């Protein structure tokens, strides 16, 4: 610590000022505050620092000194008296004294902590108020510029550590200069407060990532040393002890925030960093946590960010799933968010299907409505890229599909049934789902291949999706809805079993449907497409290569990496049971 080594020189320098008059009392030392160039006095006996010259008659100046040093000098003096368990009347409840170790008196360190840190803290707080204007210059810049100063000012660091736990290393205050020992103490204290910041002087460079150094400029540099005591008094009087500590401290935080505001957004962006900062700063000084200004915001940021993350996860899955269907199965949504997802999907489905069923009797339209509503939230299901963005196109495509393929025809009668009697929306929903299932059933009938085939995976996924959709239908206590749902589930399960039997290979994939909540959301458009493809196949015959290529393209779009999904599916199977 250059400061520590310099302290004797500092004494000499300051000697030019006050110490010219006469020697300091034993145990006292003069140091110069590198920031302001003002001399201040370190009482190693009581381990306090003060702006007031002990050689001045104690009456007024002593009082001023007490105010300068902290809310009350007596308090700080008392601390040393009860060194074993110092009492910190001056500290606000949240604040935690920062241990300050003096180089010279390593053996007495424990006491140093309390007595010394106390005054430092208070002074720093008052000064912080003063300093804030300049500090606002920019903590970051301050950190760099004042890295050098920090070497001298480590001592002050303790104070800053309490006020700005994260920033201690760069907080520069008279403390550094306050005592040659102070340099050590400050460094130790800073290290104590900031595990990551080694020597406080180094600390300025080593600040943990999120931390912003707080340059501390003392207002005193405006006033002359003689005036200092009075100036401090004035400050103290403005803010009685606790206020003195608190108000200035708030400025410190405000300043930090002012300069931090730029970093803050970043912090919000990266919840991890904000927790880090919150945590380390908290370690550094619970005092900081005491001040709602700083900590809460990181915390808030954290929670907010966390919530959005799940949300974002949930919402993207619909988007991505259409594109990589098989992938999405095991994808984050599947295992991680299934619970959340299912409700989301359920809601979407219910919302979509209810209006669908009520609004549009024709099956094709039903499908269209669903498709349009589902894709709208996730406009990037690439399986039907054009269709998804523009529901009208979807409608057209589906209408084509409906008239042309046989699968749509069976669906039509069902929809007709739905139309004729005014049915409960739940029943309509179930019927709409079963229409899709019918198309899938035909796809299953025409399916030949392995369980690893894209087509198999797609059909299975669609069926699973329909299963989940059926599960999501709310019977609302109506027996007819419940019965329809039950029948639909049975039907889907039998189709799934049939598909399994037809497929060769990899057993146990049926269970994937249990995992599929994630796929629910965006599969509807795919399903319609699938239905169309299946219809084409039925129409043209499996031998026809056109439908196959179509389906392959669709599948490729929907499930670009089939194999990854496959292992994932199998993994999912393991999980699902």
UniProtKB/Swiss-Prot annotation:
Record-listed Omega-N-methylarginine modification sites: 141, 267
Function: Co-chaperone and adapter protein that connects different classes of molecular chaperones including heat shock proteins 70 (HSP70s), e.g. HSPA1A/HSP70 or HSPA8/HSC70, and small heat shock proteins (sHSPs), e.g. HSPB8. Acts as a nucleotide-exchange factor (NEF) promoting the release of ADP from HSP70s, thereby triggering client protein release. Nucleotide release is mediated via BAG3 binding to the nucleotide-binding domain (NBD) of HSP70s, whereas client release is mediated via its binding to the substrate-binding domain (SBD). Has anti-apoptotic activity.
Composition bias type Basic and acidic residues, residue spans: 256-265, 535-548
List of residues that carry Phosphothreonine: 291
Record domain WW: where: 22-56, 126-157
InterPro entries, A to Z: BAG_chaperone_regulator (IPR039773), BAG_dom_sf (IPR036533), BAG_domain (IPR003103), WW_dom (IPR001202), WW_dom_sf (IPR036020)
Pfam families: BAG (PF02179), WW (PF00397)
Keywords linked to the UniProt accession: Acetylation, Apoptosis, Chaperone, Cytoplasm, Isopeptide bond, Methylation, Nucleus, Phosphoprotein, Repeat, Ubl conjugation
Free-text note regarding domains: The BAG domain interacts with the nucleotide-binding domain (NBD) of HSP70s and is essential for the nucleotide-exchange factor activity.
Modified residue annotations for N-acetylserine: 2
Native source species: Mus musculus
GO BP: autophagosome assembly; cellular response to heat; cellular response to mechanical stimulus; cellular response to unfolded protein; chaperone-mediated autophagy; extrinsic apoptotic signaling pathway in absence of ligand; extrinsic apoptotic signaling pathway via death domain receptors; muscle cell cellular homeostasis
Low complexity bias: start-end ranges: 158-204
Protein name: BAG family molecular chaperone regulator 3
Keyword Acetylation: yes
Keyword Isomerase attributed: no
GO molecular function ontology, one term from the record: protein-folding chaperone binding
